[in-house]
Structures are given as structure tokens and as C-alpha cells.
Amino acid sequence: IKKVLGPPGTGKTFTLLEYVDSYLEKGIPIDKIGYFAFTKKAATTAKKRMIKKHPEYKQTQLKYFQTLHSFCFHTLGLREENVMQPEHYEDLGRLSNIRSDNNKRLRITEESNGYLTSNSEYFQVINKASVKDIPIQSEFNTNEYSRKLDYQILKHLEVNLANYKDKNKLIDYTDMIKKYIKEEDKSPTFEVIFIDEAQDLSPIQWQMFDVLLTKTKDIFLAGDDDQAIFTWAGADVKRFIEQPAENQFLEQSVRVPKVVQEISNVILSRIQGPKIKK
């Protein structure tokens, strides 16, 4: 395992793609290389850069340049109509008599990275417990939520959500990860896997990472613990920091001016908790 580390603009994605090239030069087929990004935007960027650099490849040949959820989706043979959409969550909210925190229209969006945003804390708690793979009572007891949150209503909604998905044969993004882990024998194998933006992976995605370790000879992680912006939604930056690996540090940023970086370093130095140090 190798970790490519560095602040914004130091070329982490560029470095990963350079490593991709080194494997291609060894004669490794492109379909034996998995390049997974945390966000759809990052996956698309990597694919575009590869095609620009290697015009001999068509988009269809870069089928494993995608998000982790897209990889699960295609590996498991799922279809779009199998996946929970915002209107499904809103329908469930109406059926369960769940209102938004501000009494406006209930809005729920599940991003392609598996994190859910909602103006109802009830849905937020359920999703966060799911991506952290812990009981909802444990998440409820973190005291990170409003005192108005009623545990019995929360538990009732959790049951309703499970029944709703079962009745309508639907799964959410976290279900995809769990299904992949359970049905790992369906997974293709690789010579090398790259995971970009790894600091934002959730505990359930790290469980998927542990499975991927058994499906490949080499694996590269890229990220920056100082850029972990999804801890509020359940990201496990501690696992990223503590994952044993050979560390490669990138220091020169071409995106962030020196004065901005210096000010940022002052702020970052005040943040408590474990950090990756050179």
C-alpha cells in the first residue's frame, strides 16, 4: 500500500495518473487497473485526463475509472430504477409524517458519494449511522443533534425506511457498498487499484477497501487529512491517517499562493487530533 499525500494543488491526481502510466508501460491491461475516486467529479476528471493523454483509449475501455459506488453498481448488475431517489425519501417522509426542521418542504438528497443531505435531522441520523455502520441509537447518543429529536420517532422511521425499500425493491448508496462486501465473489480482480480523495471515505467504504485489498496486488491511496470535509457526514479520516502504508509527500502547490498556505497552516496547527506528518 502506498499513500500519496499533499495539500491542495500539489498534484495528487497527476501523480496517481503517472503511476497508472507506469503500470501500462509494464504491459498491464487497462481493464486490470481500477481508478476509484470519492466524487463523481474527480472520477470524471481522471478519465478525461487519461483520454487526453492516451487518445488510443475510448471511454468504454476506462470502465474502472469511476466512483466506488459506480463500481458497486455495475459489479452487482444493478439498474437505475433500483436506486433510492430524492422523491422516494420525500414520499417516505410524508408517509411517516416527518417534517423538515424548519417546517418547510422536506428536502433530501443522497449524493453519489453516499452521504445524505437533508433539512430533517431524522434522515441525517439514519444515514450517518448507516455509513458509520453503527446502530442508530449509538449515533443518536453522540449528542450532535437537536434536543427536539425524538428517539422513538427516529426508530419508527428507520423501520419504515427498511420496509419502504423492501416493498419497492430499492437500495441506497450505502446498501450498494454493503451488498458488494457481502457478494465480494462477484468482484473482478486487478493488478493495481488507485483510490483518490481517500480522506473522505466513510467506515463502510473502508470496509470495502479491506475487500479490495484482497482483489489486487498493489493499491495506492491519495488524499490530505487537512482536506477531510465530510467528517460531519461520517467520514473516517482517522482510518486514513492510521492506515499503514509507504508515504509519499508532495510539497509544492501550483494552486495555492504561498501567503494563503502560510495562513492556513496557522489555523490547521490549532486543530486537535492525529495528523499525518512528514
Whereabouts are the PLM-identified features?
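The start of beta-strands in P-loop NTPase/AAA+ ATPase cores
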Residues: 62, 191-192, 219
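Short, well-ordered alpha-helices that flank and scaffold nucleotide-derived cofactor binding pockets
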Residues: 18-25, 48-52, 178-185, 207-214
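Conserved SAM-binding loop
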Residues: 35, 194, 221
